[in-house]
Design a protein with these regions (language model features):
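Short, intrinsically disordered or compositionally biased N-terminal tails of bacterial proteins
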Residues: 1-34, 353
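N-terminal helix-turn-helix DNA-binding core of bacterial DNA-binding proteins
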Residues: 32-72, 96-103, 165-167
Length: 353
């Protein structure tokens, strides 16, 4: 077997290092990859870290609190686990967040560890304390920032009915086994929680750290380890083309300056044959609500949305409408098989052009 050097050297940028690591791992045979990963986790602290990640995402500061070890020591262990493809690392401001890999040994190994082990049980108790503190802090920050309001409730909309309609729509899709979901503008992570039973892995994107903190707490409470969240700009998603089977924009577009461009970026994420679902306000004339809730757009007509979806290279399907004080529409569009992101156009800067 060929020896493969995984470390990328100190001169590489952090992002380039992660790319180089993934490229190196792709060139390993199945046997070489397993040996590399087994060597990486064959150490007590690293096994403890993997067991903890089954409870959710953690940052380094939280892990030092849970395990009682120094940050430099834990950072080295985490780096080795990331290099071996057992953990994934994402940056959010000054914090680095770590989660289990969504496939392979990283995903499967924690379930094989002895749940009755005294050390692992103690770690779980400490982790539950940290997660509870995180949830309290997130809720307090939510209140302090003046953001504790539910837009659906403020609009007098039937949230439960809308969610039931979304689930019913997803149930009609022929999603592949282990389907991948991207929730753009995830907010508190409710859509990830709602659709978790239908997917193999889910990723929520949001620009707000406050919302991400709430989403992480929600996912941790629900034990949804196959779902995670990441800070990113929905106009410039730091993700490869054609990565997801299902992409969702839930009550996002009426806040966006350029909803057409957001749709185009969401379309870029879809695998051939993948589906984009958009839940948003139908066109309305309630200017009082538009001003009070700082909406950028007074909903969207079916013609406007179909035009934007077509401009993004998608095949639009007739929308379903949910009646209320303001109607809610669920639009569905499919990326045709055989198309590539190069076939998409970026001219749809605004749906209302």
């Amino acid at each position: 077997m060929t020896a493969v050097r995984i470390s990328t050297g100190i001169r590489a940028s952090r992002n380039q290092a992660i790319v180089d690591i993934k490229i190196s791992l792709c060139h390993l045979s199945s046997m070489e990859l397993m040996l590399t990963q087994l060597r990486a986790c064959a150490e007590p602290t690293r096994l403890r870290l993997l067991a903890l990640m089954a409870l959710g995402d953690f940052c380094v500061v939280e892990l030092t609190d849970i395990l009682g070890q120094s940050q430099p020591r834990l950072s080295r262990h985490l780096r080795l686990l990331v290099e071996a493809g057992l953990l994934e690392r994402t940056r959010e401001g000054s914090n680095a967040w770590f989660s289990l890999a969504q496939t392979g040994l990283g995903r499967d190994l924690p379930a094989k560890l002895p749940a009755i082990d005294a050390t692992l049980q103690a770690d779980r108790r400490q982790a539950e304390r940290v997660l509870a503190e995180r949830a309290r802090a997130a809720t307090e920050r939510f209140r302090r920032d003046g953001a504790e309001w539910d837009e659906m409730r403020a609009l007098g909309l039937p949230a439960e009915t809308v969610e039931a309609a979304l689930v019913a729509d997803v149930e009609t899709l022929s999603l592949p086994e282990g389907a991948t979901l991207l929730d753009i503008g995830t907010g508190t992570g409710r859509i990830l929680e709602l659709l978790a039973p239908f997917i193999g892995s889910g990723l929520g994107i949001d620009a707000s750290r406050t919302m991400l903190a709430l989403a992480r707490s929600r996912l941790s409470r629900a034990r949804l380890r196959h779902c995670s969240v990441r800070q990113a700009d929905m106009m410039r998603l730091p993700l490869p083309d054609a990565s997801f089977d299902l992409t969702i924009l839930h009550m996002v577009l009426h806040h966006s300056e350029t909803p057409g461009a957001v749709i185009t970026e969401a379309a870029r994420m879809l695998k051939p044959g993948g589906t984009l679902l958009i839940v948003d306000l139908a066109a309305h004339e309630r200017q009082d609500l538009t001003r009070a809730l700082h909406h950028r757009w007074p909903g969207f007509s079916d013609a406007e949305m179909r035009r934007a979806l077509t401009s993004a290279g998608l095949q639009a399907i007739p929308a379903a409408t949910i009646s209320g004080p303001i109607d809610i529409a669920i639009w569905r569009a499919i990326r045709p098989a055989g198309t590539t992101p190069a076939a998409f156009t970026l001219k749809a800067a605004s749906i209302h052009d």
